[in-house]
Regions:
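Key DNA-contact positions within bacterial/archaeal DNA-binding proteins
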Residues: 60
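Short, locally clustered residues in the helix-turn-helix/winged-helix DNA-binding domain
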Residues: 36-41, 103, 131
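Short alpha-helical "packing" element that flanks the helix-turn-helix/winged-helix DNA-binding module
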Residues: 31-35
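Alpha-helical residues within the helix-turn-helix
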Residues: 23, 53, 70-71
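N-terminal leader segment of winged-helix/HTH proteins
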Residues: 1-25, 144
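Charged, amphipathic alpha-helical coiled-coil/dimerization segments
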Residues: 67-125
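C-terminal regulatory/oligomerization modules of transcriptional regulators
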Residues: 120-144
């Protein structure tokens, strides 16, 4: 029963967050997740493979996602001068502006749909409980 409730709650909240982000800012949750990673990265640039790992996407999945962000002018692709096999994604000035606008409303939506349902002690307890679940390798430093 707990598993079913967890899955349904996750699906419902994710669906609402995604719909709001797309309607207000033209971003998917996956787009937003990539922008969060870049926003928190030193100089707002990361290796594409590191972004893929952080957002739990395959190499082809991150390529498709970054291609869309590049076409929108939010992110730019940069080559590694010392290794042609390595490429980077960097947050553009326009991407930074648009991300910051999306961030404000997205965090407010998270608070409305999730945070306001629990007091501080319950959120801490929930974080501790969910922390027991196995997670894929990812950086905790860039999560919002």
């Amino acid at each position: 029963m707990a598993w079913i409730r967890f899955l349904r709650a996750h699906a419902a909240v994710t669906r609402q967050l995604s719909a709001r982000l797309e309607a207000e800012h033209g971003l998917t949750l996956s787009d937003y997740d990539v922008l969060v990673q870049l926003y928190h990265a030193p100089d707002r640039i990361l290796r594409r493979v590191d972004i893929a790992r952080a957002v739990l996407l395959t190499a082809s999945g991150i390529t498709r996602l970054l291609d869309g962000l590049e076409r929108g002018g939010w992110v730019e692709k940069r080559a590694c001068k010392s290794d042609a096999r390595v490429s980077y994604a960097a947050l553009t000035t326009e991407g930074l502006k648009r991300f910051e606008a999306a961030r404000r409303s997205h965090l407010a939506d998270i608070e409305e749909l999730f945070g306001s349902r629990f007091d501080a002690d319950e959120r801490a307890q929930l974080a501790e409980l969910l922390g027991r679940l196995p997670l894929a390798e990812t950086s905790e430093a860039c999560s919002e």
